[in-house]
Amino acid sequence: MSVRLVLAKGREKSLLRRHPWVFSGAVARMEGKASLGETIDIVDHQGKWLARGAYSPASQIRARVWTFDPSESIDIAFFSRRLQQAQKWRDWLAQKDGLDSYRLIAGESDGLPGITIDRFGNFLVLQLLSAGAEYQRAALISALQTLYPECAIYDRSDVAVRKKEGMELTQGLVTGELPPALLPIEEHGMKLLVDIHHGHKTAYYLDQRDSRLATRRYVENKRVLNCFSYTGGFAVSALMGGCSQVVSVDTSQEALDIARQNVELNKLDLSKAEFVRDDVFKLLRTYRDRGEKFDVIVMDPPKFVENKSQLMGACRGYKDINMLAIQLLNEGGILLTFSCSGLMTSDLFQKIIADAAIDAGRDVQFIEQFRQAADHPVIATYPEGLYLKGFACRVM
């Protein structure tokens, strides 16, 4: 008999709506013992079967659902089916957009909670973020090796969230050849170098692909400020869009060095690109005090909020930084501003921008809205999957 997680009375509603998480407060009891990440059956208070998922005793998310089908076992064949289903969409997208790199698995939205897989050319970069994902590591890798024999697999499960579920951080080659120090990929006509070994997340922010492309329509003959520039994807796109100058700002000299290489790799005019190592908040104030002005500002900061207790402070941070950006824009200038914080809703983010404009003493029009690229889908029953949001704003 399988181990069962029994829900408290009335707490089955989210599972009946096929939400993939069971929170600790919804659990009445466990029937049997399960190890960290082990597959369990989830039943309602009367014992009716609801789902099969992975058990995580140390997490507020006590179980993550693998399947709502009682006949489905969690094995190599299960992972193969999920991977093949996800690949169909990415194949179409890659052909349409001319991509050699994309998100292959977007966790819960692809039916594989806690699993992120990005493909960069012939390298699969894997992140296992939950106890259940780690427990199924061998089955997942076996399925990947069968379906993608041409690809090396590299593990980037070196993220702090693993500690919350009682797991060690892991990183390194799983199978195949070691990735080069910098791997060239292609995106909307750009060549970009990514660092699989040490880069942010899995190496690169694939989720901003379409936003980088959209930037080009606003930048012709314009002076652009690219804040939190990382390795310069927005800068390269701005130069391809015909900007007169782009200033990229980041605290990492290593990232700025790669950004410079990316400009050179695309045979763009390096004299139009400036790279500044500095704190963005500090530099924006310096620019304001000096009377500097820009026509377009890209504001793509890291996540400001990890949990609900940090949300108020994050709102202040987003408002301050966008207020400074609005103050630096010429009349008719464009602010492209983003938040990758899952707890920051699109409505709240829009209100923050409006408040920032009021504090800056400027009127702002919202003219375009952004979200994560199409290889980062959001399944309808898991709205938390929509974490990236952004706006193009025209400053009056």
From Swiss-Prot:
Residues 2-81 form the PUA domain. Keywords: Cytoplasm, Methyltransferase, RNA-binding, rRNA processing, S-adenosyl-L-methionine, Transferase. It catalyses: cytidine(1962) in 23S rRNA + S-adenosyl-L-methionine = 5-methylcytidine(1962) in 23S rRNA + S-adenosyl-L-homocysteine + H(+). CDD domains: AdoMet_MTases, PUA_RlmI, RlmI_M_like. Its EC number is 2.1.1.191. Coiled coil: none annotated. One of its GO terms (molecular function) is RNA binding. One of its GO terms (cellular component) is cytoplasm. The keyword Translocase does not apply. It is found in: Cytoplasm. It is an enzyme of class 2 (transferase). It comes from the Bacteria. HAMAP family: 23SrRNA_methyltr_I. NCBIfam families: PRK15128.1. Belongs to the methyltransferase superfamily. RlmI family. Specifically methylates the cytosine at position 1962 (m5C1962) of 23S rRNA. This is Ribosomal RNA large subunit methyltransferase I. It comes from Shigella flexneri serotype 5b (strain 8401).
